[in-house]
């Protein structure tokens, strides 16, 4: 998580557990206008397999879908989803698994991302593929 920063430095503010894991939060933003319901980032999601989640604790009972419901809306009410960037913890919640199929969670939404980041994500250089 902290790259080349030594653990003795980052663990002062982010203590790790016995598995060297730290608490982190992903926050999304829901914006209601007169004719739009815009979601900024969709979070991690839950379509990943057990091996994936062995590296990430999912704590707390909320999901992006539950949070939208608590605000009085349904996933189908979302008109636009804007991704700040295309890392899995920001866009993973936009897709759900139905059996072997992956389908959009927000079926009525247009999806938006910065052009430069889209190009980076869809045409990675050799270092970015690693």
Predicted feature residues:
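Conserved beta-strand hairpin/beta-sheet module of binuclear metal-dependent hydrolase folds
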Residues: 1-66, 70
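A general structural signal for short secondary-structure junctions and capping/turn motifs
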Residues: 21, 102-104
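Residue-level marker for buried hydrophobic side chains located in beta-strands
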Residues: 38-40, 82, 111
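Short, glycine/acidic-enriched loop or turn micro-motifs at the edges of active sites
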Residues: 44, 88, 117
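Short glycine-/acidic-enriched loop or helix-start segments at secondary-structure transitions
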Residues: 49-50, 92-94, 123
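Metallo-beta-lactamase
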Residues: 59-73, 77-89, 105-130
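Metal-dependent catalytic neighborhoods of phosphoester/phosphodiester hydrolases
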Residues: 91-101
């Amino acid at each position: 998580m902290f790259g080349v920063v030594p653990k003795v430095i980052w663990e002062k503010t982010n203590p790790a557990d016995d598995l060297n894991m730290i608490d982190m939060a992903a926050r999304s933003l829901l914006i209601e206008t007169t004719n739009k319901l815009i979601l900024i980032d969709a979070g991690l999601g839950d379509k990943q397999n057990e091996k994936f989640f062995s590296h990430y604790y999912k704590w707390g009972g909320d999901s992006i879908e539950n949070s939208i419901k608590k605000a009085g809306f349904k996933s189908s009410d979302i008109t636009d989803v804007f991704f700040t960037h295309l890392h899995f913890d920001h866009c993973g919640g936009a897709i759900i698994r139905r059996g072997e199929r992956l389908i959009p969670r927000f079926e009525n939404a247009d999806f938006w991302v910065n052009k430069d980041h889209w190009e980076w994500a869809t045409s990675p250089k050799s270092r970015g593929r690693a």
